[in-house]
């Protein structure tokens, strides 16, 4: 990626981590349909690889604004996709895709981070990977840790995530009939792919 700054990419990862970690509340629902978010989406669409994914997400958000009981329905979608059995779901854990759940713990230790006691999910949850990537991108912009060290850790994290993210996104597309989380997972997939190629 060329036009987005490290801080902007960090913000996208942090935002996606939040949306994949718990159901949206009324405030978040209002915020994603706001003019401020529309400006943010315009910025993201200035990156050609992200354009189609952002357009689809905006379409799903527009559909949300006219969906009856939008918050409750979206909460049901979240629950069905991410909290049920893996039969017809897209579980957001590396271990659900036969990946090493200890890898993220090693990466967190290397980054000097640990999981929050407020987040009652296993460490191999998708949101933890995204928070780590957000932290690393913010660190790149700060210049306090050598960029080579941060970049090496970023690449390791992206590689570990890429081992299972495509299957997770495919399952979101398969089982999310409304399509909000399918669109969100597609944006994440493209973002991670671009980030991974930007060595």
From Swiss-Prot:
GO terms for cellular component: cytoplasm. Its main location: cytoplasm. Keywords: Chaperone, Cytoplasm. It is found in: Cytoplasm. It comes from the Bacteria. The keyword Chaperone applies. Coiled coil: none annotated. Involved in the biogenesis of TorA. Acts on TorA before the insertion of the molybdenum cofactor and, as a result, probably favors a conformation of the apoenzyme that is competent for acquiring the cofactor. Belongs to the TorD/DmsD family. TorD subfamily. This is Chaperone protein TorD.
């Amino acid at each position: 990626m060329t036009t987005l700054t490290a801080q902007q990419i960090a913000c996208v990862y942090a935002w996606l981590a939040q949306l994949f970690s718990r159901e949206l509340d009324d405030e978040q629902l209002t915020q994603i349909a706001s003019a401020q978010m529309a400006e943010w989406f315009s910025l993201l669409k200035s990156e050609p690889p992200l354009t189609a994914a952002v357009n689809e997400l905006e379409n799903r958000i527009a559909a949300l604004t006219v969906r009856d009981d939008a918050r409750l329905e979206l909460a049901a979608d979240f629950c069905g996709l991410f909290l049920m059995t893996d039969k017809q779901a897209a579980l957001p854990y590396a271990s659900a895709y036969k990946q090493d759940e200890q890898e993220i713990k090693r990466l967190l230790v290397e980054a000097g981070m640990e999981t929050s006691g407020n987040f009652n999910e296993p460490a191999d949850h998708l949101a933890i990977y995204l928070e780590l990537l957000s932290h690393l991108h913010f660190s790149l912009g700060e210049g306090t840790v050598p960029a080579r060290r941060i970049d090496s850790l970023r690449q390791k994290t992206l590689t570990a995530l890429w081992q299972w993210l495509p299957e997770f996104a495919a399952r979101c597309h398969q089982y999310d009939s409304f399509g909000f989380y399918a669109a969100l997972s597609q944006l994440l997939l493209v973002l991670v792919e671009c980030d991974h190629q930007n060595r």
